[in-house]
UniProtKB/Swiss-Prot annotation:
GO terms for biological process: translation. PANTHER family: 39S RIBOSOMAL PROTEIN L10, MITOCHONDRIAL. Belongs to the universal ribosomal protein uL10 family. The gene is rplJ. InterPro entries: Ribosomal_uL10 (IPR001790), Ribosomal_uL10-like_sf (IPR043141), Ribosomal_uL10_bac (IPR022973), Ribosomal_uL10_bac_type (IPR047865), Ribosomal_uL10_CS_bac (IPR002363). Transmembrane segments: none annotated. GO terms for cellular component: large ribosomal subunit. Part of the ribosomal stalk of the 50S ribosomal subunit. The N-terminus interacts with L11 and the large rRNA to form the base of the stalk. The C-terminus forms an elongated spine to which L12 dimers bind in a sequential fashion forming a multimeric L10(L12)X complex. This is Large ribosomal subunit protein uL10. Keywords: Ribonucleoprotein, Ribosomal protein, RNA-binding, rRNA-binding. Forms part of the ribosomal stalk, playing a central role in the interaction of the ribosome with GTP-bound translation factors. GO terms for molecular function: large ribosomal subunit rRNA binding; structural constituent of ribosome.
Length: 175
């Protein structure tokens, strides 16, 4: 890798570190290529990204960003998983690590807050941003639905009474 390519990589990593809300650091020693591809696919489906970069270049890219607290974790064969959703990368990384003991979560950073491995695992148990939005929409819509049912209930009861009266009137005329 020549100097220009290294400078481009540092610049792109710096932009990633500046814009993402969560970065997870993990050791991947012993992962097969197939396992790594599977992890990348799962991350992509969740809206997250996995990157393997030289630790020295990643350290340079971390300068001046909120997530600089992960610098001490960058030792050995490390991968960086990041996402703009504060939960996506952690959720996929933790789930993958449960099924594959070769991936070891070292920690991470959410904004300026450093996370230890337990912090990343706790973050993975939280609902995603889309799940929270769906719950809020459901909570907002529930009262409106109940109000509509209450308003329509008297009219429905009245319609049933008229229907029953019409049925009895038709039976009386037939008899």
């Amino acid at each position: 890798m020549d100097r220009a390519a290294k400078a481009d990589l540092v610049a792109s990593l710096n932009e990633v570190f500046s814009t993402t809300s969560l970065v997870v650091v993990a050791h991947y020693k012993g992962l097969t290529v197939a396992d790594m591809q599977k992890l990348r696919r799962q991350m992509k489906q969740a809206g997250a990204t996995v990157k393997v970069a030289k630790n020295r270049l990643a350290n340079i890219a971390l300068d001046g960003t909120n997530v600089a607290s992960i610098k001490p974790l960058l030792k050995g064969p490390t991968l960086l998983a990041y996402s703009s959703d504060p939960v996506a990368a952690a959720k996929v990384a933790v789930d993958f690590a449960k099924g594959n003991d070769k991936l070891v979560i070292l920690g991470g950073a959410m904004g300026a807050t450093a996370l230890n491995p337990d912090g990343v695992k706790a973050l993975a148990t939280l609902p995603s941003l889309d799940e929270l939005r769906a719950k809020i929409v459901g909570l907002v819509q529930a009262p409106a639905t109940k109000i509509a049912q209450v308003v329509n209930a008297p009219a429905a009861k009245l319609a049933r009474v008229f229907g029953a009266y019409a049925d009895t009137a038709n039976k009386d005329e037939a008899a």
